[in-house]
Amino acid sequence: GGRVLPGSAATADVLPEIADAVGDRVKILVDGGIRSGTDIFRALALGADAVMICRPFLISYYSGGTEGIVTYVEKLRAELTDAMYMCGARCLSDITRGMVREAR
């Protein structure tokens, strides 16, 4: 996990540029750094078609078995739903880049 090269750009920093370059010709799957429902929201807003999550699921499983995974999924769902509600997105396809902005 993590970026391979020190000083490499974070996924979220380059995602909009990649999404603009490929348009609808390629599905964009984002992996790395996705830990919360708000991370999912941000990735979708910046141009991802889907996100992939592994490490948090493994941690959830090792610490709580199947129940740990269920709890983690419920947390992701609640956070994503809250972010969508606060930004006026009724469904995933309503999420747009204009709903997030770069922190300075």
Where in the sequence are the language-model features?
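Alpha/beta catalytic cores of nucleotide-metabolism and tRNA/nucleoside-modifying enzymes
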Residues: 13-31, 35-104
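Glycine-rich, proline-tolerant flexible connector loops at the mouths of alpha/beta enzymes
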Residues: 1-8, 57-62
